[in-house]
Curated annotation (Swiss-Prot):
Involved in degradation of plant cell wall polysaccharides. Has endo-xylanase activity towards substrates such as oat spelt xylan (OSX), acetylated xylo-oligosaccharides and acetylated xylan, producing primarily xylobiose; cannot hydrolyze xylobiose to xylose. Also has feruloyl esterase activity, releasing ferulic acid from methylferulate, and from the more natural substrates wheat bran, corn fiber, and XOS(FA,Ac), a corn fiber-derived substrate enriched in O-acetyl and ferulic acid esters. Exhibits negligible acetyl esterase activity on sugar acetates. Its EC number is 3.2.1.8, 3.1.1.73. Keywords: Carbohydrate metabolism, Glycosidase, Hydrolase, Multifunctional enzyme, Polysaccharide degradation, Signal, Xylan degradation. Changing residue 629 to A: Marked decrease in feruloyl esterase activity. This is Endo-1,4-beta-xylanase/feruloyl esterase. It comes from Xylanibacter ruminicola (strain ATCC 19189 / DSM 19721 / CIP 105475 / JCM 8958 / 23) (Prevotella ruminicola). The gene is xyn10D-fae1A. The active site is at 161 (proton donor), 280 (nucleophile), 629 (nucleophile). CDD domains: E_set_Esterase_N. It catalyses: Endohydrolysis of (1->4)-beta-D-xylosidic linkages in xylans; feruloyl-polysaccharide + H2O = ferulate + polysaccharide. Residues 370-726 are annotated as: Feruloyl esterase.
Amino acid sequence: MKKLLVALSLIAGSLTASAQWGRPVDYAAGPGLKDAYKDYFTVGVAVNKFNISDPAQTAIVKKQFNSVTAENAWKPGEIHPKEGVWNFGLADSIANFCRENGIKMRGHCLCWHSQFADWMFTDKKGKPVKKEVFYQRLREHIHTVVNRYKDVVYAWDVVNEAMADDGRPFEFVDGKMVPASPYRQSRHFKLCGDEFIAKAFEFAREADPTGVLMYNDYSCVDEGKRERIYNMVKKMKEAGVPIDGIGMQGHYNIYFPDEEKLEKAINRFSEIVNTIHITELDLRTNTESGGQLMFSRGEAKPQPGYMQTLQEDQYARLFKIFRKHKDVIKNVTFWNLSDKDSWLGVNNHPLPFDENFKAKRSLQIIRDFDAAMDNRKPKEDFVPNPMNQPGQEYPMVNSEGYARFRVEAPDAKSVIVSLGLGGRGGTVLRKDKNGVWTGTTEGPMDPGFHYYHLTIDGGVFNDPGTHNYFGSCRWESGIEIPAKDQDFYAYRKDINHGNIQQVTFWSESTGKMQTANVYLPYGYGKVVKGKQERYPVLYLQHGWGENETSWPVQGKAGLIMDNLIADGKIKPFIVVMAYGLTNDFKFGSIGKFTAEEFEKVLIDELIPTIDKNFLTKADKWNRAMAGLSMGGMETKLITLRRPEMFGYWGLLSGGTYMPEEIKDPKAVKYIFVGCGDKENPEGINKSVEALKAAGFKAEGLVSEGTAHEFLTWRRCLEKMAQSLFK
């Protein structure tokens, strides 16, 4: 059992962090967002009373953020509910927390139609006051708040949401149809017109001569609202109103906005201000709004995986645009600390910390960006993937390793390709006006073969443009990224080729027919000096989720053998590739895996069948066993238990051998271990050194630029084969 666990741990170590056999990942490990973005902009968060009093929550705030906004405590209706009545308790607590921890604040907000101190509009008898009285009260409010907190505040949302939403271009006033006003028809506007905006900024500048004064609003990416905001701010600034910047509320969702609309808004506002803040960022899972949000509240439910991918991708796209415009974007503020705090409801899963204040993968994606990739564009030399269906142009690959996809699904809301970078679960495609979804991987893929599938609105489908390949216990789409050294597995017209035959045999131990594919070298069966030549045999195993087709097709084992034989690098031998019973194994029961079931099939049923029906040299010194990944685990377990059966052993991303595990050093002539350089290269090198020091003939390969994937294993087979049966 100890040997088994060692093998399993080595394979687990070759996988990415998020895939290591279900191990939890601490996505908060590493620098805080404020540190990751120190050369770009400040990163902030809106807080409530719990966020600044609970030690676990305050630790998150202090590590991740260098800007804080009071979610509600500073809003006029909260802090100044009645004339002469001030609720400074929570407001002071938040300000003092920031003072004590050296965190600057955004002051939100001084004047807003909602959560406002509505008493300012009426006298003690409830009758409307004149605008002069309103202005006097508003000035007193602004001066009191600003003077109390300006030592810790660097920017103020002076006026919030004063512009009308997109809607009808006309409205009825006094029974007449007139062009709709660009302004929200608030009590402020009805009393004062747009002058209240100018007055609020004038009062704020009086109180804080150096603070950054912002106009803040939502739906800034909508063309109509964007232009209304632009025109208002431009008009005000031309009149001398001290508006320093625009706050773009980021209440977005996983489908909207796209980069083009967001960038248009940023560029448009940059024409009139040199400071933009993304003030209220969250990404709702659905498109609910208003009263519909009640359906996202209550007990937390898991976020569907594909929606998580969409959300992570949207966060990555947004922050890429934010970084691009760091010259004008000075702050990005998340609206709340966790899903539990969010006004959108916990089941919208809108923030990088979940309802238990645990970091999500989206935090890691936002933080661990690659600045070099921000402006990188693929070379436009795309050609059809060599594994495409006849006549199909997509998917395409280019010389750098990028992949490009095209899917027709006009009624779909989302299409995801399960290939891509950044740990985001794939490449999210975008739909054009014709209902065609297209997209390109964020960066170059590792060269070689990759499985993938499409997720369309949560359903899993294969790409109709390419052939299907068995992996992950199902038929998947496949794509081949060109490799610099691909000639060793390329089809060559100038040489003779062997063939691959399918063999079926009855397995008494499993009670069913089993299948194997057998590679026979060119010339097999020919009579030489009056008798047929016999051949050594390599038993070559696939990994978890695969089957007997994997090595012949994805692994290109036959072509690798043909090319080695033609170049005189090896003498011909047979390769048997059988289903290894791996796919009944369930993650979570790893300690129970012994490979004993396949050992019975292999030793008692398959080998006798092969020796009976093919021209084999039927002894251990002419028999080898090797396997990739879980097939490597099987290889290690079986060769150590049954050393009398195999004289050559090979593990391909399937763990390592150590001298102390092998009871009889004379039991094996040659040991091979290999993996990709993104897996466990240290383990491979250590194993080879130890085996050689103990007197074993051992060889290793660390595949350059690859991970747990077929180019690694093709390279391993090519190298290992040259040392077998010698």
